[in-house]
Amino acid sequence: MADNGQADRKERSNGVIVGTCLAFVAGMIGMAYAAVPLYDMFCRVTGYNGTTQRVEQASDLILDEKIKVTFDANVAAGLPWEFVPVQRDIDVRIGETVQIMYRAKNLASTPTTGQATFNVTPMAAGAYFNKVQCFCFTETTLEPGEEMEMPVVFFVDPEIVKPVETQGIKTLTLSYTFYPREPSKPVAQVKAKAENKL
């Protein structure tokens, strides 16, 4: 009988260990999924890692000092697009609101959807690069062979001249990478699809 009690305790102990390990693994998987959106939110709020700021209105102050902004375009594997800036660089007055264009073309024989991510280098300048309008705020769907010009309206915040780490910056690079994405579906369509599975 003593052996039965000892075996029961050992079995319960093993069950607790297995349950703890499974909870730990589930927690780690959950944290892995949560890390990307949390880090993205942190970067958008702080401008960390070259993330630009999204604003509703233009700057009230325009300085005489100019800064060169260069434009870069990339397409991730799996998205059959040609994507380029219409112009490679521009000299702008700090605080001046400017519109530039990027051009994308779908090279596939089917509609494709992409979402652009962006950053600014040097990274210290990301917090001072303000976008008023950008194609990167939403996903973009192109029909087969369709070509589209996409605007970016931005300004460099006059505050960039104050911090020591950004005072000597004379050139910024705005870089975009388009990634493939499944097109978003309206909520009613998703709900109807879920009900059909039941």
From Swiss-Prot:
Tell me the organism: Rhizobium meliloti (strain 1021)
Instruction: Give the way it sits in the membrane.
Output: Single-pass type II membrane protein
Tell me which family the UniProt entry assigns to this protein.
Belongs to the COX11/CtaG family.
* GO biological processes: respiratory chain complex IV assembly
**Pfam families xrefs:** CtaG_Cox11
Q: Which cysteines are joined by disulfide bonds?
A: none
Query: What is the protein's known function?
Result: Exerts its effect at some terminal stage of cytochrome c oxidase synthesis, probably by being involved in the insertion of the copper B into subunit I.
Q: Which controlled-vocabulary keywords does the entry list?
A: Cell inner membrane, Cell membrane, Copper, Membrane, Signal-anchor, Transmembrane, Transmembrane helix
The record's GO molecular-function terms, alphabetically, read: copper ion binding
Q: Under which name does UniProt file this protein?
A: Cytochrome c oxidase assembly protein CtaG
Those parts of the protein on the Cytoplasmic side are 1-12
Main subcellular localisation = membrane
Membrane side Periplasmic: residue ranges: 36-198
Record field: transmembrane: 13-35
Annotated HAMAP family: CtaG
Q: Where in the cell is it found?
A: Cell inner membrane
Q: Which GO terms describe its cellular component?
A: plasma membrane
